[in-house]
């Protein structure tokens, strides 16, 4: 009977764990939807900013203007901005982006370049601190759905490093959101800004929906027509000064989009991990229930045999 009680307690424990993992899966799904809504809400501003930048670029394309954020110089030191999470229970999300950052650092070292880390997320920060890697700044405790203010703070730090000459290039290592079961750590150059990429406004948006009782992601390719500014438009300020003032805003916007996509990747990884944990809990409950029934059947059979044996002994 003691063995039966232990099995019952184990079944109860697994069922309670399953309730927790299922709740975490649903919470992650709700936050993915919030991240999706935030991306859509910021899109009109991003489109308008791209339109203005494209127009200013066209206006200044034949002029020799000095814009530090577009200036390319000899690269000696690279800042690696690594975006990870603050928490675990999200499968291989954190380990994959950390592995990609380490790989990029080795590539830079092989080229004879120095590197410094700027870390977003407690997991990557703890990892690189333990290995005594050169860390310029760390950011943790950010909102699970990144805000514009957080992106601005990080962008200001990157601008300071680049404009002061501390680093000659800034690269972003983050997880690109592909689907609920797939993500891809990528490396993207943030600074210097690419003049050819400022007018690019092609984008993909994702929508988390339910189909057949399970979650799925629908992706939609969006292409915004960037209308040129009127040729007779008169600027109160020098167009070069306006462009110089808008470029940091463009950087912050690009960084915010990357943070949002990384957050969606983390939440999707957590959804997948918790879904897998719930499935494993269901399978374990089934196995334990079978073991319990067999043990209970064996105990009942043993009791019957003892009763029969006792009756035969009395009759004999």
From Swiss-Prot:
<dbReference type="InterPro" id="IPR023632">
    <property type="entry name" value="ATP_synth_F1_gsu_CS"/>
</dbReference>
<keyword id="KW-0375">Hydrogen ion transport</keyword>
<dbReference type="InterPro" id="IPR035968">
    <property type="entry name" value="ATP_synth_F1_ATPase_gsu"/>
</dbReference>
<keyword id="KW-0793">Thylakoid</keyword>
<keyword id="KW-0813">Transport</keyword>
<dbReference type="Pfam" id="PF00231">
    <property type="entry name" value="ATP-synt"/>
</dbReference>
<comment type="subunit">
    <text>F-type ATPases have 2 components, CF(1) - the catalytic core - and CF(0) - the membrane proton channel. CF(1) has five subunits: alpha(3), beta(3), gamma(1), delta(1), epsilon(1). CF(0) has three main subunits: a, b and c.</text>
</comment>
<dbReference type="GO" id="GO:0045259">
    <property type="term" value="C:proton-transporting ATP synthase complex"/>
</dbReference>
<dbReference type="GO" id="GO:0031676">
    <property type="term" value="C:plasma membrane-derived thylakoid membrane"/>
</dbReference>
<dbReference type="InterPro" id="IPR000131">
    <property type="entry name" value="ATP_synth_F1_gsu"/>
</dbReference>
<dbReference type="GO" id="GO:0046933">
    <property type="term" value="F:proton-transporting ATP synthase activity, rotational mechanism"/>
</dbReference>
<dbReference type="GO" id="GO:0005524">
    <property type="term" value="F:ATP binding"/>
</dbReference>
<keyword id="KW-0406">Ion transport</keyword>
<keyword id="KW-0066">ATP synthesis</keyword>
<keyword id="KW-0139">CF(1)</keyword>
<protein>
    <recommendedName>
        <fullName>ATP synthase gamma chain</fullName>
    </recommendedName>
</protein>
<comment type="function">
    <text>Produces ATP from ADP in the presence of a proton gradient across the membrane. The gamma chain is believed to be important in regulating ATPase activity and the flow of protons through the CF(0) complex.</text>
</comment>
<keyword id="KW-0472">Membrane</keyword>
<comment type="similarity">
    <text>Belongs to the ATPase gamma chain family.</text>
</comment>
